[in-house]
Design a protein with these regions (language model features):
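Bacterial Sec-dependent N-terminal signal peptides
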Residues: 1-24
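Short N-terminal segments immediately surrounding and downstream of signal-peptide cleavage
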Residues: 21-35
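Short, surface-exposed charged micro-motifs
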Residues: 22, 38-40, 77, 93-95, ...
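A low-complexity, Ser/Thr/Gly/Pro-enriched, surface-exposed linker/loop concept
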Residues: 23, 27, 42-85, 124-126
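Catalytic and substrate-binding clefts that recognize carbohydrates or anionic sugar/phosphate headgroups
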Residues: 80-244, 253-255, 259-261, 266-271
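Aromatic- and carboxylate-enriched substrate-binding clefts and catalytic-loop regions
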Residues: 115, 275-294
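Structural preference for beta-strand elements that scaffold enzyme active sites
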Residues: 246-248, 278
Length: 294
């Protein structure tokens, strides 16, 4: 009997040791490997979490073209059990399923915000004009009646982006940004610059990018719209306010292409406004009689 108990204890210890070796604790997050995918979850602030996934063993180190923020010092509580690895800051709780790779996001009170779907990450290898790469797909689970906004300047006439299939690729009159904002008080930025298919249906919401070496997204919790936008600005940097004259010079495809034309347009506009204002006055300037608008 004692021999059986000893064997059972040994197997239990080996199981716990094996489980302990399946993840790597970081100062503000965790690394683990699930279902052939390396998963890294890191807090960039108490309310911003980055999820970074690559095929197992990949050494790809991505440098974002959009995200400027470096992780700030954040106190993160760490716990685990047989099923989940749990991370908790002052604002967020994150659970990583050690069997399926699914990730659940909660607010500080334990309310479910978003679910990264179990087995929801897919890497499909392909030859990108001689360069090995992947089609990258990531799926999420939203509440049935949850409203989401965003995805840029879409010409669909809809504000709520639920139950839609949109091809995110920039062109004239269609500015695409792979970012959603939920009425539950969080935002999600999918950090991939290739043409991407956004799909939302009763089963799931997903981003399916044509080219990528990783699945990389940022979860931003702000409790309301102002808080989410503040989080986005913290993550990507403050948006500069350019002078009015630049709007037609370089911010549009149908722009003024020659700097001299820009100067002529500006001068004509100034003169036109001057004449328009002076036309309301009685009299003349020099020999020019002002009558009507130009």
């Amino acid at each position: 009997m004692s021999k059986k108990i000893s064997i059972s204890l040994l197997l239990l210890c080996l199981g716990l040791f094996s489980q302990a070796q399946s993840y790597q604790k970081m100062p503000q997050g965790v690394k683990t490997t699930v279902q052939g995918i390396d998963v890294e979850v890191a807090f960039y602030s108490p309310s911003i979490v980055r999820v970074y996934k690559t095929p197992e063993g990949s050494s790809y180190d991505k440098k974002s073209l959009v995200v400027m923020k470096e992780p700030e010092e954040t106190f993160v509580e760490f716990a685990m059990n047989k099923e989940y690895i749990r991370l908790k800051s002052d604002a967020l709780q994150v659970e990583v399923n050690s069997s399926t790779g699914g990730i659940n996001f909660y607010d500080a009170t334990g309310r479910v915000l978003l679910k990264d779907k179990d087995y929801g990450t897919q890497f499909t290898p392909f030859d990108d004009a001689g360069t090995f790469s992947y089609n990258v797909r990531q799926a999420f689970l939203l509440d049935k009646d949850e409203v989401i906004y965003g995805l840029g300047q879409q010409q669909t006439g809809k504000v709520n982006q639920r139950n839609q299939k949109l091809f995110l690729r920039n062109k004239n009159m269609s500015i695409c940004i792979p970012f959603i904002h939920s009425v539950k008080g969080y935002g999600l930025y999918w950090d991939n610059y290739s043409p991407t298919m956004f799909t939302d249906n009763p089963q799931e919401m997903s981003f399916d990018s044509e080219v990528g070496d990783c699945a990389d997204y940022y979860f931003i919790y702000g409790s309301n719209a102002d808080g989410v936008i503040a989080g986005v600005r913290d993550l990507t940097g403050q948006a500069p306010l350019y002078p009015l004259w630049t709007l037609g010079f370089w911010q549009c495809r149908e722009r003024i292409r020659v700097r001299m034309n820009c100067a002529k347009w500006l001068m004509n506009t100034v003169i036109g406004k001057f004449l328009w204002m002076e036309s309301f006055r009685i009299g003349s300037i020099g020999d020019v009689i002002l009558t009507g608008t130009p």
